């Protein structure tokens, strides 16, 4: 008898409580198996009820999105025009997703949402996802972020070479918009534009160097003199002139 007790303890638990807990779990599993058909019916009813509730909420969300789209389109267009895209066409496509003639839920409701844009007169608007120009896409994202900055809850935004393919005048406008946006979000921007860099609250120099046959990157915070030197270098290249240094000082002074 004692040998059987030892075997039971080895198999089901070291204490009587462990063995009784195992019994209760096994009994519950058995009940589930015995009543599995009834349980499946009950779960199916709960699933259907939850789906219907979610569908009602998704339909309300669709209505709110549709109502907000016109205002979003107007404000994004205004921002892009400020960023020197005067012929821009921008709109949001919001379509209800269906399957077999019925509305179908997805992680964002019942909608399939896509933004379309044309930056040039006469060009057919394309999905933002298909835009090849990195600089153009960055400006579009800046415009979107500027419009929804107080609602999206994103605290940090990174822009990589948003100045690609733009003039100095446009770069300055981009910098002005980014500086304004920094009131609600932290912005990190990788740029080769003196106009944008001069508008930053904090300036870091990223530099690659050869260390014992390996390429290493360093990140150095710049003080005011360091910023003047770096802005002068961006403006003038290898040989920096006094006029370029003076221009760098003027850029910083204007934004301080």
Region locations from a protein language model:
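Extended, charged alpha-helical coiled-coil/arm scaffolds that mediate oligomerization and mechanical coupling
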Residues: 1-83, 87
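SMC-family hinge/dimerization module
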Residues: 67-137
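Loop/turn-to-beta-strand initiation segments
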Residues: 113, 153-155, 182-188
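GG-anchored amphipathic helix commonly corresponding to the ABC/SMC/Rad50 NBD signature/C-loop
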Residues: 114-115, 119-121, 135-157
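Conserved D-loop-proximal element of ABC-family nucleotide-binding domains
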Residues: 152, 164-172
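Walker B catalytic acidic pair
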Residues: 160-161
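C-terminal lobe/lid and adjacent interdomain/linker elements of RecA-like ASCE P-loop ATPase modules
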Residues: 169-256
């Amino acid at each position: 008898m004692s040998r059987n007790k030892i075997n039971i303890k080895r198999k089901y638990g070291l204490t009587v409580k462990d063995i009784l807990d195992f019994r209760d779990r096994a009994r519950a599993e058995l009940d589930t198996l015995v009543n599995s058909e009834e349980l499946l019916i009950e779960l199916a009813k709960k699933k259907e009820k939850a789906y219907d509730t979610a569908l009602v909420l998704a339909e309300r969300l669709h209505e709110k999105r549709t109502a907000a789209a016109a205002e979003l389109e107007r404000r994004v267009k205004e921002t892009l025009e400020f960023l020197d895209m005067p012929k821009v066409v921008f709109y949001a496509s919001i379509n209800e997703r269906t399957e077999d003639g019925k509305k179908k839920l997805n992680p964002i409701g019942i909608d399939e949402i896509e933004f379309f844009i044309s930056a040039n007169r006469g060009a057919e608007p394309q999905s933002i996802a298909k835009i090849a120009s990195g600089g153009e896409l960055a400006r579009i994202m800046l415009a979107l972020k500027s419009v929804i900055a107080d609602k999206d809850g994103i605290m940090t935004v990174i822009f990589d070479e948003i100045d690609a393919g733009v003039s100095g005048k446009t770069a300055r406008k981009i910098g002005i918009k980014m500086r304004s946006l920094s009131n609600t979000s932290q912005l990190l921007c990788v740029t080769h534009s003196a106009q944008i860099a001069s508008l930053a609250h904090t300036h870091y120099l990223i530099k690659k160097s050869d260390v014992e046959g390996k390429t290493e990157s360093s990140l150095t915070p710049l003080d005011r003199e360091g910023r003047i030197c770096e802005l002068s270098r961006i403006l003038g290249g290898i040989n920096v002139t006094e006029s370029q240094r003076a221009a760098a000082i003027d850029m910083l002074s204007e934004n301080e």
